Design a protein with these regions (language model features):
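N-terminal Rossmann-like NAD(P) cofactor-binding subdomain of oxidoreductases
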Residues: 2-166, 192-194, 218, 222, ...
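Contiguous C-terminal substrate-recognition/catalytic subdomains in enzyme active sites
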Residues: 61, 159-249
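A structural motif
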Residues: 128, 212-213, 284
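Hydrophobic side chains in beta-strands
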Residues: 130, 174, 214, 258-259, ...
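Glycine-rich phosphate/pyrophosphate-binding beta-alpha loops
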Residues: 201-203, 274-278
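A generic structural signal for beta-strand entry/edge sites
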Residues: 209, 265-267
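Short, well-ordered beta-strand elements
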Residues: 268-274
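Flexible, small-/acidic-enriched active-site or ligand-binding loops
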Residues: 276-282, 286-292
Length: 295
């Protein structure tokens, strides 16, 4: 679909600066661009090869924009919808009626992997552990890892702050189990596969990783599993070696390696990595297209 020229507002342009940069690379057709944030009015952000001053969110007239992308959750979503804006919600907050949501990268990652396992055999249940890069939390996560790392090397006191429950530099911080369980329950219902999920924040700037194991109702072969993963859209099965989160940076596919089947053929496991920022940008673009097509 070719897009019309957009009068585009982006909310949370400072809190999600990394994602904004990736969105800029998609070269959206713009008639006007309005970078908005609750703070930092007057600061400059780069988008589409130009520098733009950040506008105060509270003072913005939503009738001047025809589409809005929310990278940060705010009650202004309701104001944008009321003014007739097409709204794409990439904030990860509670779904808003009338807004087109952007699915979380972890959900898309798990859906692709479970889809491949289901193509190989009758999946009874699956168990996964996801390792989340700090860019999951936007610029706040990137800044916190940078600050804490510098403080440790300088032998200074490390400020934990509010972004993570514990120090993130040189550490692994589990996500609250209630949040992980809620995500697993929602996905299990959607995909028809019981799922147990653990999530943790790791001191990596970009690139999510996931280890997943599936249990089958009948034995599967290594060949069948390889074929299923090779044929599943959005997955790149590494022919040999191991994929690291750095390998996936800049791409939109889920890289899979370490694909293994148990001796009895009743369980199989895989290691997967994905560029969370790039994939989120592409999912946001797809949501934007859906919003423009909606009446």
């Amino acid at each position: 679909m070719s897009m019309p020229l957009l009068k585009l507002a982006v909310v949370g342009c400072n809190s999600a600066a990394g994602l904004l940069e990736t969105l800029s690379e998609l070269k959206l057709p713009l008639a006007a661009f309005y970078p908005l944030d609750r703070d930092d009015e007057g600061e400059l952000v780069s988008f589409g090869g130009d520098d733009w001053p950040v506008l105060e969110l509270a003072d913005f007239d939503w009738k001047t924009a025809d589409v809005a992308i929310f990278l940060a959750h705010t009650d202004a979503i309701a104001d944008a919808l009321a003014a007739g804006c097409k709204v794409v919600d990439a904030s990860g907050g509670e779904p808003q009626r009338g807004a087109v949501p952007v699915p979380p990268v972890t959900d898309v990652l798990l859906a692709r992997l479970l889809g491949a396992f289901k193509a190989a055999g009758d999946v009874q249940f699956a168990v996964g552990t996801g390792l989340l890069a700090v860019s999951q939390e936007g610029q706040a996560g990137i800044d916190k890892l940078s600050e804490q790392t510098r403080a440790i090397f300088a032998q200074q006191a490390v400020e934990v702050g509010t972004t993570y429950a514990k120090r993130i530099a040189f550490n692994v911080v589990p996500v609250a189990q209630e949040k992980a369980a809620a995500s697993a329950t929602k996905l299990a219902k959607k995909l028809g596969v019981p799922l147990s999920l653990q999530l943790a924040h790791v001191p990596v700037f970009y690139g999510h990783s996931l280890s997943i194991t599936a249990r089958f109702g009948a034995p599967v072969t290594a060949d069948a599993l390889t074929t299923a993963f090779t044929d599943t859209g959005g997955i790149y099965l590494l022919p040999s070696g191991t994929a690291s989160s750095q390998d996936a940076i800049g791409g939109d596919q889920v890289w899979v390696s370490n694909l293994a089947v148990s001796d009895d053929g009743l369980s199989a496991s895989a290691w997967a990595v994905v560029d969370n920022s790039k994939l989120t940008a592409l999912l946001t673009l797809a949501a934007l297209q859906a919003a423009l097509e909606a009446r």
